[in-house]
């Protein structure tokens, strides 16, 4: 059997729509696609560690309690490119995809509160797989093709409140929506008709996240920061249509449809159990910070509709361990630009929870990045890089090596702040 991976990604963006870009991963075939990191470029550049951070001018999406510490109105948007090198043990294929990953606005309120809202990429589907089977004499006997594209987005609204005793609490509400198209075709040598199965589905639902953040002053400069974030149990509904038909086998998948074998509608449910993020670290405000984060969740549950009678893959418990930090030599330096640059780095190891052919699909990565100041203000251009590996080529599976580049722009201003009159 020979696997050949071809991935095509398209991003369409307008003021009225945020269209999902496809992933470049064959693992996006499973469930509702690849789960995108719901974190800022700054957080991902520190090994995805961010739950203990509470900046006055940067958004941390991990913990909504951090919004209570905002002092500046902050507008951010981000995009990136992911390059995958996939290996099935016999062949390698390189593919890439680019996407706008988030747009968000954070607004301070009354000095101890903050609001944040925006649009984020949530999951991404994008794959094109070719399986070929040959007879003993080397003659091509059968071809199976698998196509998929789409995914989900989320609109969120977060609120944080900072109490006088260094404790902050936060809440985030989100609406998830999107669509996924999947196509499977089969052609056999010397058989006049091929078969094709089409699945089109729409997904929607709501999620709720709670957060808490505490700062303990160890001395005049050093602080200990602790963050806890909890995604409450949520359910997404997936509704769609399935169509199975025959087509004239003309040597490709462009044959003319002949007969409809089956046409049906379906409803599926995706249940996401409670997800907990524990994060802690210490450092000096606007100077340096080092921290660790542990995330864990019980298995996702896919039931009904297109997920009935699936036995070659399942979901187990999810967990992620991150360690990372940042360093800014001198934030207010007037003579040396590079002393005002913030340098970030981190590592992470993740058990994705996906199990295929009784084999766990795990992932690890190394990340680093910089925040480049724009002039003498707090606005920054953030660059992030990530190198890692997911999966294995053992047990007839695919190993994925990925190289991610991310870019975000963080603009800060004094909107809605009362001017002092002397």
Predicted regions and their residues:
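Bacterial Sec-dependent N-terminal signal peptides
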Residues: 1-24, 422
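Subset of outer-membrane beta-barrel
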Residues: 20-422
């Amino acid at each position: 059997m020979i696997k050949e991976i071809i991935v095509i990604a398209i991003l369409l963006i307008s003021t009225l729509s945020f269209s999902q870009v496809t992933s470049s991963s064959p693992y996006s075939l499973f469930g509702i696609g690849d789960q995108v990191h719901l974190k800022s470029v700054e957080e991902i550049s520190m090994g995805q560690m961010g739950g203990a951070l509470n900046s006055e001018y940067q958004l941390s999406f991990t913990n909504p309690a951090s919004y209570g510490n905002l002092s500046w109105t902050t507008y951010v948007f981000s995009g990136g490119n992911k390059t995958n090198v996939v290996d099935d043990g016999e062949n390698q294929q390189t593919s890439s995809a680019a996407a706008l990953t988030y747009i968000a606005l954070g607004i301070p309120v009354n000095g101890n509160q903050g609001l944040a809202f925006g649009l984020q990429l949530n999951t991404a589907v994008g794959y094109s797989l070719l399986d070929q089977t040959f007879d003993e004499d080397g003659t091509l006997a059968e071809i199976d093709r698998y196509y998929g594209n789409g995914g989900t987005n989320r609109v969120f609204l977060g609120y944080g409140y900072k109490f006088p005793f260094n404790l902050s609490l936060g809440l985030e509400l989100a609406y998830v929506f999107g669509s996924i198209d999947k196509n499977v075709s089969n052609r056999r040598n010397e058989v006049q008709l091929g078969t094709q199965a089409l699945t089109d589905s729409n997904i929607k639902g709501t999620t709720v996240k709670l957060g808490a953040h505490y700062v303990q002053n160890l001395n005049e400069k050093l602080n200990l920061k602790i963050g806890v974030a909890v995604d409450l149990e949520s359910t997404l509904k997936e509704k769609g249509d399935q169509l199975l038909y025959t087509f004239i086998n003309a040597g490709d998948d462009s044959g003319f449809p002949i007969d409809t074998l089956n046409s049906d509608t379906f409803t599926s449910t995706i249940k996401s159990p409670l997800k907990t993020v524990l994060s802690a670290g210490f450092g000096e405000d606007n100077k340096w910070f080092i921290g660790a984060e542990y995330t864990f969740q019980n298995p996702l549950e896919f039931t009904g509709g297109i997920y009935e009678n699936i036995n070659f893959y399942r979901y187990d418990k999810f967990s992620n361990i991150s360690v990372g930090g940042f360093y800014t030599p001198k934030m207010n330096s007037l003579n040396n630009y590079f002393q005002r640059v913030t340098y970030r780095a981190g590592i992470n190891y993740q058990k994705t929870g996906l199990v295929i052919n009784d084999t766990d699909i795990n992932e690890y990565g190394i990340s680093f990045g910089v925040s480049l100041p724009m002039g003498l203000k707090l606005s920054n251009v953030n660059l992030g890089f990530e190198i890692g590996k997911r999966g294995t080529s053992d047990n007839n599976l695919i190993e994925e090596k990925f190289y991610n580049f991310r870019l975000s722009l963080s603009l800060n201003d004094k909107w809605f702040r009362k001017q002092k009159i002397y």
